[in-house]
């Protein structure tokens, strides 16, 4: 099991890394905008200054070619630390497949079903990020979805890991 921090506030992340239980950091454009900083500066601080070993970097783009181009940029710049965060859309899944082929780690976000998680795993995703809180907010069982995905992944010996996202509380 791993715990990832969802933030772009460097001093908060640095403080929490001292606990020794944080395995990585996930970011997104909204969090970076709230930080008031330029995305590349945030990523450089996370990786180079405070030494985060696994940073999910959400790339811009609507179509696979743009997602791939942006994924390559960060995937090659920080080979050992960058995990490229892509949307679970047909274009995102195409990009995932290509980036996986190139040896670049991926985190598929906006996963809301077992079927989506399976497609991401088949494309070679390193992580799938089911949105637990959003599912719960809409009357669905987010943790139940995690259980179902885990069952399918375990049964099929899938290497893709599940990274629960959008968790609203620790209960």
Regions found by a protein language model. Give the residues of each.
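Long, contiguous hydrophobic alpha-helical segments, chiefly transmembrane helices and signal peptides
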Residues: 25, 32, 110-111, 165
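Short His-Asn-centered micro-motif
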Residues: 6, 86, 109-110, 165
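Active-site beta->alpha loop and helix N-cap motifs at the rims of alpha/beta catalytic domains
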Residues: 2-14, 19-21, 27-98, 132
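Catalytic alpha/beta core domains of metabolic enzymes, predominantly
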Residues: 90-96, 105-107, 114-171
């Amino acid at each position: 099991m791993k715990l990832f921090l969802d933030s772009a506030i460097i001093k908060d992340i640095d403080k929490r890394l001292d606990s020794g239980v944080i395995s990585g950091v996930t970011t997104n454009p909204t969090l970076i905008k709230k930080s008031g900083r330029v995305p590349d500066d945030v990523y450089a601080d996370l990786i180079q200054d405070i030494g985060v070993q696994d940073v999910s970097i959400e790339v811009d783009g609507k179509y696979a070619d743009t997602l791939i181009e942006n994924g390559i940029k960060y995937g090659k710049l920080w080979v050992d630390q960058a995990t490229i965060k892509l949307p679970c859309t047909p274009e995102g899944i195409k990009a995932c497949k290509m980036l996986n082929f190139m040896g670049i780690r991926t985190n598929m976000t906006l996963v809301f079903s077992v079927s989506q998680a399976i497609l991401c795993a088949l494309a070679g995703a390193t992580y799938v990020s089911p949105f637990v809180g959003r599912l719960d907010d809409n009357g669905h069982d987010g943790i139940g979805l995690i259980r179902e995905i885990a069952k399918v992944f375990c049964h099929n010996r899938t290497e893709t890991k599940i990274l629960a996202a959008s968790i609203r509380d620790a209960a």
